[in-house]
Amino acid sequence: YSSLREELSEAGGAVIDLSGFPNLSESVIHGLAVVASGFLPARAPVLLMDGVDHTERLLRITAELGLAGAIVDVKTIGSAPAIAALPTVGIVLSKQKSEMSVLLRIDWTPSSSDILTVVAAGMHGILSEPFLGQSEPPPTTVKKIATTLDTDIQFREKEMRGWLQQMGAANLNDLKRHHLRSVTYEAAAMSGLRLEGYRQPLPMWSRK
């Protein structure tokens, strides 16, 4: 307990991973959040994290506690799970009235299209380890890591600016779900996005 207090007192924030404690009651989760907030420096953020199957509960508890945000964890390699999570996260977010940051945690290096898709769905960004899935060995020194990340970020920014212009959005803040299109039937069926060339989502998403 004392070591936890000491560590958190010097931390910039805390993430409580609920997936590691699947049987915790909501009262215990509330208690953990209160303890973390009390031990952290003033204004340091506390976030909750859980799997995409528990998105509704995750965001509800985050809102009730007035925490800084939530992390929706998608653990399957590939872009399909992120697409499949869009309807669930988007619907739950639309019901939330409180201000919070919502991030999508993935276990692959996101492409520019992944980033735009997640932001258009109403989330605020992607959480991922750098250099995942690369064929070349990752840089090891601080200087090389910083240089590589800076180059990668600049490339993605340039690529995303071009796509935003094509979609008619001035910046990321203007990007909405209706700007997105699916290029395959499978992606359209999973996400509820409109298939390229069609004005409406697929029938299973259009039914009321």
Model-found features: residue ranges?
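Alpha/beta catalytic cores of nucleotide-metabolism and tRNA/nucleoside-modifying enzymes
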Residues: 91-101, 112-116, 120-208
